[in-house]
Each structure stands twice: as C-alpha cells, then as structure tokens.
C-alpha cells in the first residue's frame, strides 16, 4: 500500500510540476502539489466564475443566510460542491495557522482575530474561504503569490448599533 501511495504522490507531483497553473498555485502558503492539482481539476475553467465569491459559493465555503425583513443572520457554511476540495483548503488553512513564515503573518493575524471572536474552527474555515479567493485571483490574473498584496482587515470592527 505504501508503494502505491508513493507512486500516486509522484504522479501528482509530476502533474503539478508540468501544469503551469498548478505550479503557480503552489506558491501560495499551505498549498502543495496535491491541493494545487485538485484545485485545477475541480475548477477546470476559472472563467466560469465572474468573482471569487462565486467560486467560494461553488466550493461551499460561504455561510448560509437566513433573512427576515431587515434582519440578516449568517449560519454554518453551505457545504455545497466538492467536499474533498473544501477539505483540502481547510487543511491548507490549518497549515497557514501553524506556519511561522513572514509570508503568512497577515493571514494568520486576520484569522486569529476571527478566532478570538468566533472560535478557532470558524476562523479556519474563514481562512480556507480566503485562500480560495487568493487562488482564484492568482489563476485569473496569472500571477504568483505575493504576501504584500494581501490586505487583511486588521482594524477593529466598528461597534454595532443597538
């Protein structure tokens, strides 16, 4: 079994190395050959999505909404779409949180701020959604990951009106 796993890993790594999109996506933090290859296979054509939000919805990473009148309540993620891709993005988010690299500092700080308010598991899923948006932009704009382009919302949220 270990030999078969090694062969499969080698094939995935070879695909990621040969595919220019997958190679570019592996420059993002937490994204290795398996996640990049799976993302390319799951999405196929990035032009199907006009915005990163559409891609995040396709992957089931956006919260479901229950609205009534002017009251808007966000719930758990929808879990629509490819569950394995969603799982890979969540695992990549955990990798980012554990990383001490300066390239991940802004993403970690943003996620930890959410964790203080909502809990670590919700923060990890939010980071996975953010990572999906980053991968979308990298693919769409044909660029490699640049930590300086990440603009986290680190300022404190304004107090809510009662």
Predicted regions and their residues:
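A detector of single, family-specific signature residues
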Residues: 1-162
